[in-house]
UniProtKB/Swiss-Prot annotation:
Ca(2+) 4 binds at D122, D124, D126, E133. The keyword Cell cycle does not apply. Ca(2+) 3 binds at D86, D88, D90, K92, E97. Potential calcium sensor. One of its GO terms (molecular function) is calcium ion binding. Keywords: Calcium, Metal-binding, Repeat. Ca(2+) 1 binds at D11, N13, D15, K17, E22. The keyword Repeat applies. This is Probable calcium-binding protein CML32.
Length: 146
């Protein structure tokens, strides 16, 4: 099952984000005796931007952090997350693709803000986020969590 498929199963109301209640329901399915406090701690750790919802990028980052997986597993999860943003499948993410995905997730970033996001990680200056640049960006996010 892919990252996107798992995310969609947990996202019961299909709004593109996982609420605390959706998260708690999924966690309790695997660990019925877990306390609400433990769920809160896990949720806060995954919810990097602090908006009280887990988006697909935060979820993918969590999977990479939490597992005992190897580099190959990490690359597979990373590629699936990248593909969610690479709408046209051309192997690179544009500012407009980021804008579309974020809009679907209920975010309100402007196209100008999305262009700034791309520029922040665009190491080769081509105006797009390559898979390698995406991996670097996600690795930086993971280090902030640890």
């Amino acid at each position: 099952m892919s990252v996107a498929e798992i995310f969609e199963r947990v996202d019961k109301n299909k709004d593109g984000k996982i609420s605390w209640d959706e998260f708690a329901e999924a966690i309790r399915a695997f660990s019925p005796s877990i306390t609400s406090e433990e769920i809160d701690n896990m949720f806060r750790e995954i919810d990097v931007d602090g908006d009280n919802q887990i988006d697909v990028a935060e979820y993918a980052s969590c999977l990479m952090l939490g597992g005992e997986g190897n580099k190959e597993d990490e690359d597979i999860v990373m590629k699936e997350a990248f593909d969610l943003y690479d709408i046209d499948g051309d192997g690179k993410i544009s500012a407009s693709e980021i804008h579309v995905v974020l809009k679907r997730l209920g975010e309100k970033q402007t196209i100008a803000e999305c262009i700034a996001m791309v520029r922040a990680v665009d190491a080769d200056g081509d105006g797009f986020v390559s898979f390698e640049e995406f991996k670097t960006m996600m690795s930086c996010n993971n280090k902030k969590l640890q």
